[in-house]
A protein has these predicted regions:
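Helix-to-loop junctions at the C-terminal end of transmembrane segments
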Residues: 65-76, 264-278, 362
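Cytoplasmic helix-loop-helix junction between adjacent transmembrane helices
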Residues: 107-143
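Juxtamembrane intracellular "pre-TM" segments in multi-pass secondary transporters
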Residues: 2-9, 188-220
Length: 390
């Protein structure tokens, strides 16, 4: 394992490994989405209670981002990653054998918290890549992460239909074991760059939030965009179970394939960060999401309308996430994990908020309410960008 040096470049094999593991680990947070209707029926709970599984998973991820990712500046990242993978595997097994929904909530919270591993990789790509390749390499890791998010829905949709929702989480546990072995074999040791205690480290995170307006801006507008995207996925299984579709989890998985092509565009978008700038990409991304939700509202009773909406909302999110996350890390390269913690914690709070609001909207107003929530969140992101010059 070659020792990494700041701004000196990363081997392609390590970059590829990080992208693959990023996709496989973040997938833990999204396996449940196509399976919500199956879980609801199996456990005899309401749609709102089933939707809370997705909500607590996102909250868990946000907690992991807030309290675990900063440790990458203090302790061995390799060791933290290995521990997280081990706990994630155990929690996936807990979910698979749970007979009560509250156990699923608790295990999902911890599974989400331990699935933050990709957020150790993005700072590595940003910190150790050559300056000319930073955006491209971060985009490459992001494409792996986004492909994992979307492919996880495809896989879980089909596995749920063919084998059952519990079997999907057993498979997830096995995947974590494989990732753990890969990490031990390929991931190099990276020296910590913070001298002090964990308490002091966390204080420095809050100091960065209070003192750096740009990082706050980058994080907040991306968070609203992520909330907009999560709105469509958190209620898609419920929508497809109704007229005129009457479809199961396998169709949710099939629609997930539509977003994969868009996710692969993230590596290409990385090149545009330097050319177009963060603000322009943020404007384009929010506008794409507004078009997506208009399409979902007007043509949401057709598969073609849903496909177009899914593709546009995903590409719009990528424009915002890649540009703003890159901006955060480059703003404070000496504290890359802490800057990324601020960005991604805010980001997933936005995702949890979007998921929760969409669930309430679905309960009271159906698909029209979900579209309204998604459009409002995208519009807020757009307004923030219009009002700011950064």
């Amino acid at each position: 394992m070659k020792q990494l040096k700041e701004n000196k470049g990363i081997e392609r094999s390590l970059l590829l490994t990080m992208a693959v593991i990023a996709g496989l680990t973040v997938a833990n947070c999204y396996y449940n989405q196509p399976l919500l209707e199956m879980i609801r029926h199996d456990m005899g709970v309401s749609q709102h209670e089933a939707n809370l599984i997705t909500v607590v998973t996102q909250i868990g991820y946000a907690l992991g981002l807030c309290f675990l990712i900063p440790m990458g500046d203090l302790y061995s990242r390799r060791r933290i990653i290995v521990i997280n993978m081990s706990v994630a595997a155990v929690m996936a097994v807990f979910i698979a054998f749970s007979q009560r929904v509250w156990i699923v909530w608790g295990a999902s919270l911890l599974l989400g918290a331990c699935s933050v591993i990709p957020q150790f990789f993005s700072p590595i790509a940003g910190q150790y890549s050559e300056k000319k390749n930073k955006g491209r390499n971060m985009g490459f890791v992001l494409s792996g992460l986004l492909t994992g998010i979307l492919a996880s829905r495809v896989v879980s949709g089909y596995v749920g239909e063919w084998l059952g929702w519990r079997e999907m989480f057993i498979i997830a546990a096995l995947i974590m074991i494989v990732c753990l072995i890969l990490t031990l074999k390929i991931m190099p040791q990276i020296d910590s760059n913070y001298v002090g205690t964990y308490r002091g480290l966390m204080k420095s995170v809050f100091h960065i939030v209070a003192s750096n307006a740009r990082i706050r801006l980058y994080a907040i507008r991306a968070a609203f965009s992520f909330g907009s995207m999560m709105a469509i996925w958190s209620c898609l299984a419920f929508r497809l179970a109704q007229a005129p579709f009457f479809s199961g989890s396998e169709m949710v998985g099939t629609l997930g394939m539509c977003g994969i092509a868009g996710a692969l565009a993230a590596s290409g978008l990385g090149k545009l960060v330097n050319q177009w700038g963060i603000r322009k990409l943020s404007l384009y991304g929010a506008c794409l999401q507004l078009v997506a939700w208009t399409t979902a509202y007007l043509f949401g009773d057709t598969y073609m309308g849903l496909i177009v909406a899914i593709i546009l909302v995903d590409i719009g999110l990528q424009c915002l996430q890649l540009s703003n996350q890159s901006g955060c890390i480059q703003e404070m390269p000496e504290a890359s994990n802490r800057a990324n913690t601020i960005f991604m914690t805010t980001y997933f709070i936005g995702g949890s908020f979007g998921t929760y609001c969409a669930g309430l909207a679905w309960t009271h107003e159906g698909w029209m309410g979900v579209c309204a929530v998604g459009a409002v969140l995208a519009a807020i992101s757009l307004c923030i960008t219009i009002c700011c010059t950064k």
